Amino acid sequence: MYLNQVFVSKALALQLKNALMALGCPTENRVLILSPKDQDIIQGGIIIPGQAKDELPNKGVVILQGHLDEEYKWYTDLIETGRILTYGMYAGKEIEFNPDIFRKEGISLDLDKNKFTVLSVNEIIYSEVNNN
């Protein structure tokens, strides 16, 4: 089942990275991603009922990476800023930022439609190139 999702571009991911780096970054083997909140329509326009959505993995765009331990260095290319990650439904922890941070940098981002999540690289199921 493929969701009809729209992800932020790699260029916007890099802008977000620059804006957020002044505030800090994920610790150790973690990554900050930005995901669309509403993931209820599959390709073809079929609406997915609430219970069925619980079984689907989440996807999001990498914004920031923490410092990888030696044993996780091989993840480096898989979690570079702008890549799209697939991760489990219950993986990660949502985190909120003040929208003014982005406005000051001239970044237009609708936080009602997007969410930030920090997850461990162990929770990543799949990594793909972002063609946006």
Model segments located where?
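Compact, glycine-rich, soluble single-domain proteins
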Residues: 2-132
